[in-house]
Amino acid sequence: MSITCQCPLAEALPKIPNASCPVSFGQIQKVAFQRLRNSTGKANEFTAEAAITKKASWTELLTAQDATKIVVSPYINSPADSGGDARTTSGGNDDLGGVATIIGSEPIQFTGSLRAIDQSIVKAMKELICEANAGNLGVFLFDENGNIEAIQDETTKTTYRPIPIRSFFVADKVHGNYDAKDSNAIQWSYQPNYSDNLAIMKPEDFNPLTDLVNAE
């Protein structure tokens, strides 16, 4: 994504909030997938009335039979994010004084491993590849403490949406043989600036790792 700067610049530098406490998400252990929008283009979201912190709100979406449906992944091992580097001009003689200019940022790529998983689960998850290719797939992240990470609406702070992802992929099985378990690689990409409105929530009456189960 390219950086678009206001021109002319504002009268003063932007206000930067003061840090009051550290904020860090834990190890990503599971995720929930949901379409970003329904067939009419309306965004899928949790609201004050259907709170993201209440199990009942999730149960309704897990059992849904329409575009609001949510599905939960198996446990994901070896979760890792990479990328997000600055995109720059080439520097050298192409730039004044040889100093490169920042023109944007690279996407963040998530990778993980599904270990000892029934391949019927993997087969079903591969259908999500087309959902992501259509630009209509998002995830909610669950850490080892049962916290949830999602996109918070800038105006209505009680509204939360899935994190948009692209380039979703689940690989075929790699046999672990003697020293390891069989595994399937999983990956997707977040678009630049995806985390600008990212928020962490603690559920009130459930643990998403153990209490959210896909409908049969």
Which residues fall in each region the model found?
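Solvent-exposed edge beta-strands and adjacent loop segments
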Residues: 2-111, 163-180
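Polar/charged alpha-helical tracts
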Residues: 11, 60-63, 68, 123, ...
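Short, hydrophobic/proline-enriched secondary-structure or compact coil segments at domain edges
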Residues: 31-37, 110-113, 135-146
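Oligomerization/assembly interface segments of phage tail-like spikes and tubes
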Residues: 97-123, 179-196
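Short acidic, glycine/tyrosine-flanked loop/strand segments centered on an H-E-D-like triad
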Residues: 109-119, 145-172
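General structural signal for secondary-structure boundaries
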Residues: 118, 132-134, 198, 205
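Short, acidic/charged, Gly/Pro-enriched secondary-structure junctions
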Residues: 123-158
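Mixed-charge, glycine-accented linear interaction segment located at domain edges/termini
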Residues: 159-216
